[in-house]
Swiss-Prot record:
High-level lineage: Bacteria, Pseudomonadati, Pseudomonadota, Gammaproteobacteria, Enterobacterales
Source organism: Shigella flexneri
A GO term, aspect molecular function: maltodextrin transmembrane transporter activity
Signal sequence interval, chain numbering: 1-24
Subunit structure: Homotrimer formed of three 18-stranded antiparallel beta-barrels, containing three independent channels.
CDD domains on file: Maltoporin-like
Name of protein: Maltoporin
Length: 445
């Protein structure tokens, strides 16, 4: 029994405990940083095939990058709650002690769970958010990612799966114009590209296997009295089917995606193509993405006994544009890991890229091999933090590149694929090889 003398102390302690619980902040994030050298001299170089949308990342990252996430459950009553989430990202070239940069405010959203009585388990949200992103870690490639400012309702239980609805936005500088004066159009504004996303996930279709289906529609949302650049892509669709299978203490994901017009450029669900690209003082040129994209992707991570883990990826992507400036991209790679102890391992990554230009018919190819000795917090290929020392060798042979010489009003090939020796020039990276070595840390928490 609490006496009256002890009651104020008990109340104070209880209030302090409740206050501490109420003020608890979740701290999550990701970071990587290190130092590297190039065999022929100078700082570490990184290797990516011209025309490829990503690169094999182990021992092949030349920047310091960090995402710092702070979040808190700010209200809870029974099973109903509100959660506030933020994310600030930084990237610098890791060349000096003091490297100033402007942070990117990538997330600021509120998620409300179980707020709709007749939709138990669902979440409504609004704000900037990383929204249900799908990626291949070993090549840092996001193949389904509509992140940005938006709003939505997710995880609606429909009996055989979970339904999610969302709308997000990505803007392009100079994407539309207004009539100014003297027959001049002003391209300094931005075009708002809206994306509307519908997903049906967690459909159990076989033992250990689930299916997710999605449809994304993107369109340019013009202001009144504005017009799109001639030839710009106004809208497009992305259709996605992904099967996830539990296998060998890991997973395998098989993905098929088909996109049209404005959804083909990045091919991940963000609408692009209503914009105008600028190159310093050069004139503007429009981005015409009309056409289609087909992507077939298989990737995963598995455990092969007590001492071996492995990541792998294989992908074919065909972007076929009406302006013949598309590409066909094949990539295949593996990252086996041998565990000497629960905290020390040797990791090797072997990756190959081949990119064919639709316009020239020429091909760029590269293979890259990295060997790394690593110390990590656990015995999984996903264990982090990790500190690794590495050596990387890359060899490439590029027969084409993009022409950015002059300006778009003088050079009819500006921004287009051309042969490596076009007009006596030198486009692409030629035929060469290089090796690098260094040390890196990587962490997520």
């Amino acid at each position: 029994m609490i006496t009256l003398r002890k009651l104020p102390l008990a109340v104070a302690v209880a209030a302090g405990v409740m206050s501490a619980q109420a003020m608890a902040v979740d701290f999550h994030g990701y970071a990587r940083s290190g130092i590297g050298w190039t065999g022929s001299g100078g700082e570490q170089q990184c290797f990516q095939t011209t025309g490829a949308q990503s690169k094999y990342r182990l021992g092949n990252e030349c920047e310091t990058y960090a995402e710092l996430k702070l979040g808190q459950e700010v209200w809870k009553e029974g099973d109903k709650s509100f959660y506030f989430d933020t994310n600030v990202a930084y990237s610098v070239a890791q060349q000096n002690d003091w490297e100033a940069t402007d942070p990117a405010f990538r997330e600021a959203n509120v998620q409300g769970k179980n707020l709709i009585e007749w939709l138990p388990g669902s979440t409504i949200w609004a704000g900037k958010r990383f929204y249900q992103r799908h990626d291949v870690h070993m090549i840092d490639f996001y193949y389904w990612d509509i992140s940005g400012p938006g709003a939505g309702l997710e995880n609606i239980d429909v009996g055989f799966g979970k339904l999610s609805l969302a709308a997000t936005r990505s803007s392009e500088a100079g994407g539309s114009s207004s009539f100014a004066s003297n027959n001049i159009y002003d391209y300094t504004n931005e075009t708002a590209n809206d994306v509307f996303d519908v997903r049906l996930a967690q459909m159990e279709i076989n033992p250990g296997g689930t299916l997710e289906l999605g449809v994304d529609y993107g369109r340019a949302n013009l202001r009144d009295n504005y017009r799109l650049v001639d030839g710009a892509s106004k809208d497009g669709w992305l259709f996605t089917a992904e099967h996830t299978q539990s296998v060998l203490k890991g997973f395998n994901k098989f993905v098929v995606q088909y996109a049209t017009d404005s959804m083909t450029s990045q091919g991940k669900g963000l609408s692009q193509g209503s914009g105008v690209a600028f190159d310093n003082e050069k004139f503007a040129y429009n981005i015409n993405n009309n056409g289609h994209m087909l992507r077939i992707l298989d990737h995963g991570a598995i455990s092969m006994g007590d001492n071996w883990d492995m990541m792998y990826v294989g992908m074919y992507q065909d972007i076929n544009w009406d302006n013949d400036n598309g590409t066909k991209w094949w990539t295949v790679g593996i990252r086996p890991m041998y565990k000497w102890t629960p905290i020390m391992s040797t990791v090797m990554e072997i990756g190959y890229d081949n990119v064919e230009s639709q316009r020239t018919g020429d091909k760029n190819n590269q293979y890259k091999i990295t060997l790394a000795q690593q110390w990590q917090a656990g015995d999984s290929i996903w264990s982090r933090p990790a500190i690794r020392v590495f050596a990387t060798y890359a060899k490439w042979d590029e027969k084409w590149g993009y022409d950015y010489n002059g300006d778009s009003k003088v050079n009819p090939n500006y921004g287009k694929a051309v042969p490596a020796d076009f007009n006596g020039g030198s486009f692409g990276r030629g035929d060469s090889d290089e090796w690098t070595f260094g040390a890196q840390m990587e962490i997520w928490w």
